[in-house]
Amino acid sequence: MTLYTAKDISKNYQSGDEILPVLKGINLSIEHSTMTAIVGASGSGKTTLLQILGTLTKPSSGKLYFKECAVDEKNERELAAFRNASLGFIFQFHHLLPEFTTLENVMMPALIGGKNNAESRANAEDLLRRVELHHRLEHKVTNLSGGEQQRTALARALIMNPAILLADEPTGNLDSRSGEIVFDLLKNLGQERQLATIMVTHNNELAARMDRCVTLLDGSLQEE
């Protein structure tokens, strides 16, 4: 069974009297335990597509299916629960909460999802060990380096053991060494957890190391 399917996804924006089509009839199927790169020029709609796949933005038309169940039939409360339980997100800018520690940031989705404090803490500590930040548990995230912040964001994205990880330029704001560390962690942890990873990237070398690469060009998706 295909894990996630986008069928005939289109997205238009209104600019005065003009309608601007950004995505045109996108079809994309995502299988279990695969890494898919989405590449394309700046402004081609890559982030818009990722936001639609993450149910953060609604398409103008088209359908999303998760394990053959229509995602668009869910109400806002059900969508929020779906995102927290089944989708993990990591962005170019980590979006960590600066007033909280590394450990607290990673625990947050689990607590919101109804996990108790002890279970949330144990899972967060385990993930932070996996991303080699066990020595930074009680540090405020503002005291971490850029690479450490992004590794914290990765641990947070995995805390609910999602089926799909959506990554928007996760290495784009890092130096080459830190970016390589984050990518290797994404790949290795994804394989271990049998995640499907969908990554928007401008880095063609990273895209070539994934199972699949698709290109957004003039609003349409092309397989490479």
Curated annotation (Swiss-Prot):
The complex is composed of two ATP-binding proteins (LolD) and two transmembrane proteins (LolC and LolE). It comes from the Bacteria. ATP binds at G40, A41, S42, G43, S44, G45, K46, T47. It is a peripheral membrane protein. Part of the ABC transporter complex LolCDE involved in the translocation of mature outer membrane-directed lipoproteins, from the inner membrane to the periplasmic chaperone, LolA. Responsible for the formation of the LolA-lipoprotein complex in an ATP-dependent manner. It is found in: Cell inner membrane. It comes from Desulfotalea psychrophila (strain LSv54 / DSM 12343). Residues 4-224 form the ABC transporter domain. Keywords: ATP-binding, Cell inner membrane, Cell membrane, Membrane, Nucleotide-binding, Translocase, Transport. The gene is lolD. One of its GO terms (cellular component) is plasma membrane. SUPFAM superfamilies: P-loop containing nucleoside triphosphate hydrolases. Its EC number is 7.6.2.-. The keyword Membrane applies. The keyword Cell inner membrane applies. PROSITE patterns: ABC_TRANSPORTER_2 (PS50893), LOLD (PS51244). One of its GO terms (molecular function) is ATP hydrolysis activity. PANTHER family: ABC TRANSPORTER ATP-BINDING PROTEIN MG467-RELATED (PTHR42798:SF2), LIPOPROTEIN-RELEASING SYSTEM ATP-BINDING PROTEIN LOLD (PTHR42798). Gene3D superfamilies: P-loop containing nucleotide triphosphate hydrolases. Belongs to the ABC transporter superfamily. Lipoprotein translocase (TC 3.A.1.125) family. This is Lipoprotein-releasing system ATP-binding protein LolD.
